[in-house]
């Protein structure tokens, strides 16, 4: 065999390439990209699942925000000058007294229970506040001082409740009690359950009582 033919075969073999060399290249060939644009997470969760989860969280957040905003809106409506439909015995009795000047003096379960509640609120904003300021150190008080304040208010309220119970026990036929209790029962019978379910705050009760006392003095 001539040297020329040997060289030609060697060149052809190099152009064709070695089969083993091609097999070694195959594992390193890049894979074709998937047409889907949703990458697979390690846990098997796709981006669509992540979207659903984020959407649920966003929905819960919006619902929570709406629930929180309801009391705020209600407060703004009450302080914006609009008439508040909620009532308490003080307002009902004062309105009735204004239209019935011959009505008897205040008495009855609703009157006394509201009066004692007003006294407790008034004690917190006045007497107990002053006592706290006298006992506080860096705007703080210890347990002994707090216990003293609590027992002081308890003693006052206990006495008022005992007086009310004594009156109901020994004056069961009190005309004034029957009169004013019937007035408030008639009021409750003509109001909606939604209005009565709304709780009156201590500040509103105290403000109504002060207005009533001012009207009575005039």
UniProtKB/Swiss-Prot annotation:
Keyword Disulfide bond (UniProt): no
Region feature (Disordered): 1-89, 195-218
Polar residues bias (residue ranges): 58-67
InterPro entries: Bocavirus_NP1
Coarse class of the protein's main subcellular location: host cell
Classification via Pfam families: NP1-WLL
Segments of skewed composition (Acidic residues): 196-205
Biased amino acid composition, Basic residues: 8-18, 27-40
UniProt biased composition (Basic and acidic residues): 73-86
Superkingdom in the source lineage: Viruses
GO CC, one annotated term: host cell nucleus
Keywords: Activator, Host nucleus, Transcription, Transcription regulation
Localization per Swiss-Prot or TrEMBL: Host nucleus
Family affiliation: Belongs to the Bocaparvovirus Non-structural protein NP-1 family.
Function comment: Required for the expression of the capsid proteins. Performs the splicing and internal polyadenylation of the viral capsid-encoding mRNA precursor, which allows its maturation and expression. Transactivates the viral promoter.
Protein name in UniProt: Non-structural protein NP-1
């Amino acid at each position: 065999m001539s040297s020329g033919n040997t060289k030609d075969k060697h060149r052809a073999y190099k152009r064709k390439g070695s089969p083993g060399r091609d097999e070694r290249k195959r594992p390193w060939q890049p894979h074709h990209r998937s047409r889907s644009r949703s990458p697979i997470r390690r846990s098997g969760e796709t981006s669509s699942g992540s979207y659903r989860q984020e959407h649920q969280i966003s929905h819960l957040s919006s619902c929570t925000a709406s629930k929180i905003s309801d009391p705020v809106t209600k407060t703004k409506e009450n302080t914006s000058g609009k008439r508040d439909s909620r009532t308490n015995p003080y307002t009902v009795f004062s309105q009735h007294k204004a239209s019935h000047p011959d009505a008897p003096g205040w008495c009855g379960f609703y009157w006394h229970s509201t009066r004692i509640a007003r006294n407790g609120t008034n004690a917190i904003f006045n007497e107990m506040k002053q006592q706290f300021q006298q006992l506080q150190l860096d705007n703080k008080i210890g347990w002994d001082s707090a216990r003293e304040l609590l027992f002081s208010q308890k003693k006052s309220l206990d006495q008022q409740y005992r007086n009310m119970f004594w009156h109901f026990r020994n004056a069961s036929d009190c005309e004034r009690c029957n009169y004013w209790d019937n007035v408030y029962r008639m009021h409750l019978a003509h109001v909606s359950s939604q209005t009565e379910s709304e709780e009156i705050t201590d500040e509103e009760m105290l403000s109504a009582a002060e207005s009533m006392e001012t009207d009575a003095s005039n």
